[in-house]
């Protein structure tokens, strides 16, 4: 069975300073993300064993663990691509037009996305996603690593609101972290994801 692996980053840990510190990025990548990778591989191994033993209680437990850790791995893999030392500013082209159509303007989108991030209770993510059935952009709060995700959604942009993503630098002032996040958003990556979502996933659930 193929194992999940920790992806390399496209930039050095210090590259996002002063907006996100090198210390945070290094710990976030080598400790937190690595733990999710180990967790998903462990869950898969235990799930295989439980199935062989027809232990349904263990199957259900490890399916839950798999969902959590795989969610953490996927979310963080997207997170690193969503960030760039050359990021910031605003999107252009088709993505900019889609944001204007869905939210009224980029400033209104930014305010709504930031409110989703700052208003999150507990741990999770704020997400901009593409609804493959309604052919529209949506923002929503993702709880923990896998909960409250609308079906048929392709994530395009996410901000990590777990405390490990910001506390060493911003303490409990989440709003300052979210404000800093906009300075390193890799809009080229978000545009690439939007193009793929709109061209390859029509009616995702129904085929």
UniProtKB/Swiss-Prot annotation:
The keyword Manganese applies. One of its GO terms (molecular function) is metal ion binding. Binds 1 Mn(2+) ion per subunit. SUPFAM superfamilies: Fe,Mn superoxide dismutase (SOD), C-terminal domain, Fe,Mn superoxide dismutase (SOD), N-terminal domain. Mn(2+) binds at residues 28, 76, 160, 164. InterPro entries: Fe/Mn_Superoxide_Dismutase, Mn/Fe_SOD, Mn/Fe_SOD_BS, Mn/Fe_SOD_C, Mn/Fe_SOD_N, Mn/Fe_SOD_N_sf, SOD_C_sf. Its cofactor is Mn(2+). Its EC number is 1.15.1.1. Keywords: Manganese, Metal-binding, Oxidoreductase. It catalyses: 2 superoxide + 2 H(+) = H2O2 + O2. Destroys superoxide anion radicals which are normally produced within the cells and which are toxic to biological systems. PANTHER family: SUPEROXIDE DISMUTASE 2, SUPEROXIDE DISMUTASE [MN], MITOCHONDRIAL. Belongs to the iron/manganese superoxide dismutase family. This is Superoxide dismutase [Mn].
